[in-house]
Amino acid sequence: MESIPAQTNYRVGERDLKYYIFDWDDNILHMPTYIHLERRLANDTWVPHLVSTALFSVIRNDTANYRPPEGDWEKAFVEFRDLATDDISKFLVDARLALDRVLQGIENAPPSFETFRKTLVEGRIFAIVTARGHCSSTLRRGVEMFIERVLSAAEKAEMLANLRGYVAYYDGEDVNLAKSDAEILSDYLALNKYHAVTSPQFRQLVEGVLPDPDRSEARKQFAVRDFVEHLFNIIERIGAKRPISVGFSDDDPANVHAVEEYIRTELARRFPSVRFVVYDTSDPTLEKGHKIVVSGQLDLGLD
């Protein structure tokens, strides 16, 4: 990260407590990562067929015409894993390509691109919850790449000023002054959650906890709950007494519906003081997606 003079925005300590949960693919970035399937032809033979994540969300239940190679979903999603043979994660390679296409004006950014950018600049705590199978550290490196390549020098300075403001407000000015910009940024990134819900790491987290751990929707529900519990642990530690809101955005209607129902039936009852808002970003023509207020009254300010 380029050198930026350290400043502190002391006003951030009075902000509302707004937090965000983002799906990655086709929500933050259109990743050039493909799912390896087989497609049935008219003569009942099967041929290899590469599918984008956007198309897969539409055809994934069409088992009559699409199937994984040799019936093995691991082979279908090989590009969505961190492999020991890779010098650099396929996720990071594809993230760089996807960012290039947006920054060069080749394609429009997905619906949550600018919201994610704003979240980083404001120094808000967030979670990445994706159906990918990468390590959490890989997702974090993707966020670091986004910060480095997307944020302008002025936005990076504003982000650091906001982060220093939070540190000064909650941990004290001595702690703020003792830390370098690199340490401030690293501490912030460590506060966030990076859940790739088909990764071996995440499977260990849900094993014995979820009755149906193989369902992507169930894993995303668990990841959302884990993040909200994480937030409340932080809020209790710092003793903040302000309105709390959590926004969730995803481009897959099945995930949107599953999380919306989970919030209504479980999280809204457990956390009645929180305003939960879900954004369905499956329609790329809607700039920030279709907004669904699930519970609470506080405006997230994303309209």
Spell out what each predicted region is.
Residues M1-E2, L302:
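Non-Sec secretion/translocation targeting segments of pathogen effectors
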Residues E2-T198:
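Alpha-helical substrate-recognition element adjacent to the catalytic core
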Residues V12, D16, L120-A127, G133-D303:
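C-terminal cap/substrate-recognition subdomain and adjoining C-terminal extension
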